[in-house]
């Protein structure tokens, strides 16, 4: 079962589970979803624990891919995590939690799962607290849980700093928005690869009770990523680059920029993950080359009208 099935990660995970031959129930707040044939769709707000207990009934694995706009994190995210935990616990199911790397803060070198949580942002503090809550539920015997982590995501329907602000303008001849530096090594993850890794974690008892970093391609600089995007759209992509000061200034009139400004450190220093624990235990995973992932993303944006600057959230 996938909770948060309307988002980029959730919709990719629905497709991945179908490819694996699994029966899939997709949950979003409206109960309306353009899902592939064979998918059961139901309405449910992750913050409503009683509803989560109802929709999780009969599930063996519950994938929590819920995310909300930055501006609603503090008020909505904890309740959403608790609600899905309650549903998984009632069903005696495993809960797989889709996570990021914001809890580590500023680091030097590739991030490993053994790093201490030293968040430098409010959202990183919340991510650390949520992760601890998810693992504590497992350690206390309430419900089996596992966490899959990705750095910044990109791909079809992904709402991130590498989402509509970048790909939408590239297709409409507008300036693409890039935050941070252009010459630092990054490890963006294609959303289909994230979905593959999450699905894999849900199938192995050996994965339970901890967080795993999922595999990405070799690091790439922002400029090289933009060059690949330019090649895909057959013209140089114009870029509006925002540093921390300009993002905070823009935040005076644009709440998304205000909320996102504290995360710019990720794009102003090397930001990569070490997934060797995962690959040693489960194999190489699915790792899509950047050129291929960018091509798939451009194809998706070329057939959707949702190209304006977005709210940001996975």
Q: Language model features by range: what are they?
A:
Residues 100, 132-157:
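Conserved beta-loop-beta element that borders a ligand/cofactor-binding pocket
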Residues 23, 82-129, 146:
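Conserved Rossmann-fold NAD(P)-dependent oxidoreductase catalytic core, especially the SDR/UDP-sugar
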Residues 158-165, 179-202, 209-213:
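Substrate-positioning beta->alpha
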Residues 1-20:
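N-terminal Rossmann NAD(P)H-binding glycine-rich loop of SDR-like oxidoreductase domains
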Residues 74-78, 109, 120-132, 152, ...:
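Short-chain dehydrogenase/reductase
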Residues 30-91:
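NAD(P)H-binding glycine-rich loop region in Rossmannoid oxidoreductase-like domains
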Residues 7, 195-260, 275, 280-281, ...:
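Mid/C-terminal beta-alpha module of Rossmann-like enzyme folds, strongest
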Residues 140, 151-185, 229:
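NAD(P)-dependent short-chain dehydrogenase/reductase
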């Amino acid at each position: 079962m996938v909770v948060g099935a309307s988002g980029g990660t959730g919709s990719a995970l629905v497709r991945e589970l179908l490819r694996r031959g699994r029966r899939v129930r997709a949950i979003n707040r409206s109960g309306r979803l353009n899902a592939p044939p064979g998918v059961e769709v139901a309405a449910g707000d992750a913050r409503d624990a009683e509803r989560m207990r109802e929709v999780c009934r009969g599930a063996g694995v519950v994938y929590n891919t819920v995310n909300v706009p930055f501006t609603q994190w503090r008020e909505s995210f904890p309740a959403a995590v608790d609600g899905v935990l309650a549903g998984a616990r009632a069903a005696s199911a495993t809960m797989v939690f889709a996570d990021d790397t914001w809890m580590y803060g500023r680091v030097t070198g590739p991030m490993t799962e053994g790093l201490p949580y030293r968040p430098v942002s409010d959202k990183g503090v919340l991510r650390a607290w949520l992760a601890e809550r998810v693992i504590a539920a497992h350690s206390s015997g309430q419900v089996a849980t596992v966490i899959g982590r990705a750095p910044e995501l990109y791909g079809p329907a992904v709402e991130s700093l590498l989402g509509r602000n970048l790909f939408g303008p590239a297709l409409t001849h507008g300036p693409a928005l890039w935050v941070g530096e252009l010459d630092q090594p990054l490890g963006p993850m294609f959303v289909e690869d994230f979905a593959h890794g999450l699905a894999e974690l849900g199938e192995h008892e050996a994965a339970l009770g901890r967080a795993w970093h999922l595999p990405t391609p070799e690091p790439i600089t922002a400029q090289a990523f933009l060059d690949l995007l330019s090649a895909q759209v057959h013209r140089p992509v114009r870029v509006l680059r925002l540093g921390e000061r300009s993002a905070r200034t823009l935040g005076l009139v644009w709440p998304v920029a205000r909320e996102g400004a504290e995360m710019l450190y990720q794009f102003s220093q090397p930001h990569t993950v070490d997934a060797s624990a995962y690959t040693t235990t489960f194999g190489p995973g699915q790792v899509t080359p950047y050129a291929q992932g960018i091509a798939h993303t451009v194809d998706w944006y070329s057939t959707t009208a949702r190209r304006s600057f977005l709210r940001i959230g996975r």
